[in-house]
Structures are given as C-alpha cells and as structure tokens.
Amino acid sequence: YIGIIPARYSSTRLPGKPLAMIGDKPMIQHVCERASRALPEVWVATDDHRIADAVTAFGGSVMMTSPDHRTGTDRCAEVAMKIAGEDDVIINIQGDMPFISPESIKLLCDCFSDPLTDIATLAAPFARAEDMQVRHKVKVLVEDDGWVYNFSRTPLKKGTAGMDDPEDWMAKNFKHIGLYGYRYETLMRITKLPQSQSELAESLEQLRWLANGYRIKCAIIPEDTISVDTPEDLLKAIQSNKDNTH
C-alpha cells in the first residue's frame, strides 16, 4: 500500500490551505503523520514549491507534478506511475483532513482483501437528517454487502420501496468521505476515461468510474472527520486541535 496526498496551493475559498497552521504544524504535516501511522510509504503530490519545501522541512517525501491535472486522482496517477508497481494499491488521502484516523485508512485498505474490489472509499452516518439536504455533503448509497450503488449531491434511493420515512433514508444514505484506494491498473485506466454525463452534471469524478463498470467497495466509519474547505473550517480545526492536545 502506498499513500499519496494530492496538495494544491490555489484554492478559491482558502488559498494555501495545505500550509495553514493548526497548532504548531502545517495542515499537510498533520495529514502526513497520520497517514504514515497506517501506511508503510506516504508521498505528497504537489505542483507548488512552497508546499514541497514545507514537506521537505518536516522530513516528508514529496514529488512535484504537472500543474494541469483536473483532479487529485490524476495527480495521484502521475506519482504512482513513477513509484508504484502493478501489484500495489494506491491510497489517495485528502490533504485537507488533518484529523483523519490511521484506523480509517486501515479500514480502507482492508477492502482490498476482496479480489473483486477495483476501488475503495469511506463513508460515515449522517449526524442529522437535515445534513442530507446540503449539496456539498456528498451522499453515497451503500448496499448491505458494502458495494456502492451510487453517489449524488441529493439524497439517493434505490427504487421506491420502503423509503418514505426519513429514518429509512438515513439508514441507506451515508456521508461520503473523499478517501480512495485503487489497484494500480485500475488507477491507470480510470484516469484515461472520458468524463461521463453523470460526472459532469454532479461534478463528481467517482460517477465516471461507476458508469464504466468499476466496482467500488465502501467501508463505513463511525463518524465524519473534519474537512477544511473554508476559513471557518480552519478555525474549527484549530479549536479541535487545542481541545485534543490539552
């Protein structure tokens, strides 16, 4: 298993967020340290020298990538081509999840004990029913055997039976957490696929993979993890870090 953390400096809502300080460390260092407790090899993939310099300064492994990638998956594929072998599983870890637990990453890896798993991801129960109506909280409908049925920005149902009650919706819809694992060959193939109509409509690259028949296994973790997208999220992360270090 090889962990790759795609990290961009330019973010519309929070520029330079991988270098945002949480306590006495930049966010990217928090992510690297947690990933390294779960995986034998972890790399940061970036197109920005400021991020590369910061990673080198704390002793992390970093690789410069093309600035032209559309997605973090594409950035991962560029690095994987240089460092991974055909039997490797690549774990794509979001650089804006400073408190991702090593246990969650290990659960993601465990999905590959099933030889039918092409891709794996994580999800958590929604804390509140009203959160299911928030578009940026991506929903994933997970079958009882752990296979993903679909992803959407709106609540999902499979057929119409037994989904009248909000409790039923909550039982089937989980909050998607954007970590992915891919078998090496799968990663090489999915990054060459043309964008699907469903992907373009929802701005969710994982819909391209489902549309092309790739099987995605989803591990359920007990609760969501903080994702830093806005200045408000960063303040929450700083406070959470304080609460957990005292």
PLM regions with names:
Residues W43, H49-L107:
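Short phosphate-binding loop-to-helix
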Residues T46-D47, I100, Y182, D229:
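A conserved hydrophobic position in a structured secondary element of the catalytic/binding core
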